[in-house]
C-alpha cells in the first residue's frame, strides 16, 4: 500500500481558477498526509533555487514535463509501490517550465500526457493520479478498467 505521507508536491504558481482549486481540495481530503508546497512565480533560475532549498538529499525527485516517461495509471501505481515508501517529491513547473539542470537532477521525469497543460491543471491531474494509485494498490473501486 502507498504511504502518501512520503510524497510531496512542489508547484510553481497559485491556483487561480476556483473549479481547479475545488478539485484539488477534494482529492487532498482523500489523501491525508500529502504535502503541497506552492512557490511564487518568478524566473526559472529563482524558482530552481527555491526548489533546491526545499528538497532534501534523501528525497527521490520527480519532475513533470512533456518529455518525461508516460505511464498508465496502473503502471504509475506499480512504480510508486516499488519505490518502497521512499520520500518522493514531485515538481511541477510554472508557465516557463523547469530548468534543464533541475530536470537533470531528477531521479526520473514524468509526463502526464504528450499534451501540454497549464500548471494548475497539471497539479490537479497529478493529485488525482496519486489518489488513483493509492486506490489501485488498495484494490479499491475507484479505478475501473
From Swiss-Prot:
GO function term, MF aspect, one: rRNA (pseudouridine-N3-)-methyltransferase activity
Keywords: Cytoplasm, Methyltransferase, rRNA processing, S-adenosyl-L-methionine, Transferase
CDD domains, per the entry: RlmH-like
Subcellular location: Cytoplasm
Gene Ontology CC entries for this record: cytoplasm
Short name of any one Pfam family annotated for the protein: SPOUT_MTase
Catalysed reaction equations from the record: pseudouridine(1915) in 23S rRNA + S-adenosyl-L-methionine = N(3)-methylpseudouridine(1915) in 23S rRNA + S-adenosyl-L-homocysteine + H(+)
EC nos: 2.1.1.177
UniProt enzyme class: transferase
Annotated family: Belongs to the RNA methyltransferase RlmH family.
Biological role: Specifically methylates the pseudouridine at position 1915 (m3Psi1915) in 23S rRNA.
Complex and partners: Homodimer.
Name of the protein this chain belongs to: Ribosomal RNA large subunit methyltransferase H
Amino acid at each position: 500500500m502507498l504511504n502518501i505521507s512520503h510524497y510531496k508536491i512542489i508547484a510553481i504558481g497559485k491556483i487561480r481558477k476556483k473549479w481547479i482549486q475545488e478539485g484539488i481540495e477534494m482529492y487532498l481530503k482523500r489523501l491525508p498526509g500529502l504535502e503541497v508546497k506552492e512557490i511564487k512565480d518568478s524566473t526559472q533560475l529563482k524558482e530552481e533555487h527555491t526548489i533546491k532549498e526545499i528538497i532534501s538529499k534523501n528525497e527521490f525527485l520527480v519532475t513533470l514535463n512533456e518529455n518525461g516517461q508516460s505511464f498508465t495509471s496502473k503502471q504509475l501505481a506499480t512504480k510508486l509501490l516499488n519505490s518502497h515508501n521512499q520520500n518522493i517529491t514531485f515538481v511541477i513547473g510554472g508557465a516557463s517550465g523547469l530548468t534543464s539542470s533541475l530536470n537533470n537532477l531528477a531521479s526520473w521525469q514524468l509526463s502526464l500526457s504528450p499534451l501540454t497543460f497549464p500548471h494548475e491543471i497539471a497539479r490537479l491531474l497529478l493529485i488525482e493520479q496519486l489518489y488513483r494509485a493509492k486506490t489501485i494498490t488498495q484494490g479499491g473501486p475507484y479505478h475501473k478498467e
